[in-house]
Amino acid sequence: VGTRVVRIEDQQLITQGGTYVEDL
């Protein structure tokens, strides 16, 4: 219950190295 790292393969978003941090 904080943040999680999701690969762009799961969510088509690009920020750094093909991953982004989603605040929950």
Swiss-Prot record:
Keyword set includes Oxidoreductase = yes
Q: Does the keyword Oxidoreductase apply?
A: yes
State its Enzyme Commission number(s): 1.2.99.-
Recite the UniProt cofactor note for this protein: Binds 1 Mo-molybdopterin cytosine dinucleotide (Mo-MCD) cofactor per subunit.
Q: Name one GO molecular function term.
A: oxidoreductase activity
Keywords of the record, alphabetical order, are: Molybdenum, Oxidoreductase
Q: Which cofactor does it need?
A: Mo-molybdopterin cytosine dinucleotide
Its subunit composition reads: Heterotetramer composed of an alpha, a beta and two gamma chains.
The entry's function note states: Active with aldehydes and formate esters as substrates.
Query: What is the name of this protein?
Result: DYE-linked aldehyde dehydrogenase, alpha chain
Organism, as annotated: Amycolatopsis methanolica
